[in-house]
């Protein structure tokens, strides 16, 4: 993924700005899905597409891209449940 910011239009008329970059030899993104502050997510290998999340046993967001379409989910570490937040996101 090329460094820079991309804005994705998602279902329900919502948008998400995703800033792609590199830090400490890792592919990262910065997002602000809640409007309360930026979150940095790190790239993790997956079978198909790209996935970014935060290595944590707690709660965190996951940004997954496959075939040009993104999904932002929220992983509740306490309950072990992952819930889609933004779906069908396209640049």
Write out the residue ranges for each language-model feature.
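Cysteine-centric segments in proteins
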Residues: 1-91
